[in-house]
Amino acid sequence: MALQPASGARDLLPRDVGVNRWIAEQLAAVYQRWGYEEVTPPSLERIDTLEAGGAIQSHQVVQVVADEALGLRPEMTASIARAACTRLAAMQRPLRLHYRGSTFQAQRAEDQGLRIVEDLQSGVELMGAKGLAGDAELLRLLLDAGSHLPLSAEHQPTLLIGHQRLLSVLLEAVEPSLRSTVRRHVCGLNRVALSQLELPGQQRLQLLQLLQLRGEPAAVLNGLEALLGATDLLAELKQLISIIEEQASRAGIRLQLDPTFHPDFELYDGVMVKLVCQGLDAPVAIASGGRYDALVQRFSPVGAVASGVGFSFAVEAVRQLLEQADQLPPRLDGQLVLVAYSQSSQLHPALNLLEQLHQSGQPAELWPEPCANQDEAQGIATQRGVQTVRWVG
């Protein structure tokens, strides 16, 4: 009999579960203040829904043996977009939804078998808010949610902002047969490979300059304007930054504009964001998202104007980040009381006392064996991390 969990799986212990719940509740309270309602999409979906029209690769989906092609969701957005365009199609837009739940990703290493990585997520989806207004609400909400987590200056929280169309505009001048290769090298920040491609000199120079454009938004926008000229896209990005920069400063979150930013899933066709913090050894991404109008369009009636934008927090990553910095919240079940008794005949009154404490809202637990005296009971309580003993003698 196997005594270890499956490859990629983890046992969550009571403290882990309690902190995860606390983090998710802090985030949900923020979402609800912004008018978002909670939904729970199914863990199982049809493969064509999960693959989101090619945005997610089939090897990333944990497939389930069934009469039809089913899989476990690798992310939440596709399932919620499907529900929004079918079960919730009659509801007035914009539609504001939030969720919490586990996602499952299939990962394969060259010399290893399949690993199934389960991750707890908390996030929002905003359907029917097009353009700048939807993007601005999403980023303001993300900053608000991030500010309600106990992150410190040592975490150096940074919000990376990119846009799918930025790189596409630059790639329009590239020979079509080379575009996917150039995109891969640019997103991978591979200067050497980019320099070796058969590209016109000015075009290569512009792409190499693009690799340097990453950092403070105003400076990056100026650099992009020098490369692209004044465009509506840059004007919209400039306006978006102006809407969020003051709130980001108050929240202690640095803004970084990165034209080469490319997320793991190719869901996005507009603005893209990732909230990154400094861990003990390396940066840790705790939230990500963006605009996915094409995905919503896929689930919508032909000819309908559809739009969607959203983000999700990786709850486990947040918990581990707080654990490393010793910034976890105090015991989350209140000040627990231990009820102890002296002999077997006192079990009944001890349980009655336990019930009274529970009815008054006091967390309490019963020690199941008789104790010789109160000192023994207090010693047991101390070992269990409990300060208060209620004695039935």
UniProtKB/Swiss-Prot annotation:
One example of a Gene Ontology biological process annotation: histidyl-tRNA aminoacylation
Gene source species: Synechococcus sp. (strain RCC307)
Localisation: Cytoplasm
One Gene Ontology cellular component: cytoplasm
Pathway the protein contributes to: Amino-acid biosynthesis; L-histidine biosynthesis; L-histidine from 5-phospho-alpha-D-ribose 1-diphosphate: step 1/9
Keyword Cytoplasm annotated: yes
Assigned keywords, A-Z: Amino-acid biosynthesis, Cytoplasm, Histidine biosynthesis
UniProt-recorded name of the protein: ATP phosphoribosyltransferase regulatory subunit
Superkingdom: Bacteria
Further facts: This function is generally fulfilled by the C-terminal part of HisG, which is missing in some bacteria such as this one.
Similarity comment: family membership: Belongs to the class-II aminoacyl-tRNA synthetase family. HisZ subfamily.
UniProt function note: Required for the first step of histidine biosynthesis. May allow the feedback regulation of ATP phosphoribosyltransferase activity by histidine.
Subunit structure: Heteromultimer composed of HisG and HisZ subunits.
Broad class of the protein's primary localization: cytoplasm
GO MF entry, a single one: histidine-tRNA ligase activity
